[in-house]
Amino acid sequence: MDFFWERMLNDPQNHFSDDQKEFLNHAKYRVKRNTIFGMLVGFSLPLYLARNKKVTPIRLYATSIIGGLAGNGVAQITTLAYNLSAIRQRDDGFEILRKIQDSLIRQRTTMRQGRFPSSSSEFPPKNSKYQLPGSMPNTGASSSQDPFTNSQSTEKEDAMYSKDNGFEDRSKPASAWEAIRNRNRNTGNNSFPFYEEDSSVKSTDSAFSGQENSEAFPSRTSNLGSEQLDEPISHEQEAFDQLIWNDSSSSK
């Protein structure tokens, strides 16, 4: 927090005056002082209240820790409210709040990008020794490089950033079934799975639509006679009769 606070005060785009910087530094010191005081009071208050009572040490220490955390929170909230009221009482209070808000927005944008701005006047400076999470280390290389190399490095950084945020590249299908779905979607065919049709293979839809399809079903004018068509059925009938009646002749 001290790092971001110092960067906010020293940001050239904010243009804080010396009086405003002194006021903000005093407000920061007030927050630290009251936070420590609140933690001490919250930690020691249960010890003072339980001095004449029989309380187990573990329970007493746990209550003291909880009291210290509660005192810290109460002190921070109270001090923040006091600082805001003190800012509003100043003539330039709204200007200070606007500068703080603009600085916080720039800091958040810089952290989301994960890299430092190219200009040293922006927050944070490029030659800073502090590295934000996800930022690339500064190797001191010259900025005048091949634009093709810069574009490749930018693409690599974007790919790494997308993987870190849970986004995957959907340009390639994840499986064979997804490739089939994509191909059916592009060709407008709703059948699944998809297969290529050629002149030798007819669609089953045309066979059931009432059209003539000699390759799917035999036509009425086929050369196959009724005897040849009934031959497998007659063999099955004879086998059945022989099994039941012990006779090769069919039963009437």
Swiss-Prot record:
<feature type="compositionally biased region" description="Polar residues">
    <location>
        <begin position="136"/>
        <end position="153"/>
    </location>
</feature>
<dbReference type="GO" id="GO:0005739">
    <property type="term" value="C:mitochondrion"/>
</dbReference>
<feature type="region of interest" description="Disordered">
    <location>
        <begin position="108"/>
        <end position="252"/>
    </location>
</feature>
<protein>
    <recommendedName>
        <fullName>Uncharacterized protein C19G7.18c</fullName>
    </recommendedName>
</protein>
<keyword id="KW-0496">Mitochondrion</keyword>
<dbReference type="GO" id="GO:0005829">
    <property type="term" value="C:cytosol"/>
</dbReference>
<keyword id="KW-0539">Nucleus</keyword>
<feature type="compositionally biased region" description="Basic and acidic residues">
    <location>
        <begin position="154"/>
        <end position="172"/>
    </location>
</feature>
<dbReference type="GO" id="GO:0005634">
    <property type="term" value="C:nucleus"/>
</dbReference>
<dbReference type="GO" id="GO:0006897">
    <property type="term" value="P:endocytosis"/>
</dbReference>
<dbReference type="GO" id="GO:0005768">
    <property type="term" value="C:endosome"/>
</dbReference>
<feature type="compositionally biased region" description="Polar residues">
    <location>
        <begin position="108"/>
        <end position="122"/>
    </location>
</feature>
<keyword id="KW-0963">Cytoplasm</keyword>
<feature type="compositionally biased region" description="Polar residues">
    <location>
        <begin position="201"/>
        <end position="226"/>
    </location>
</feature>
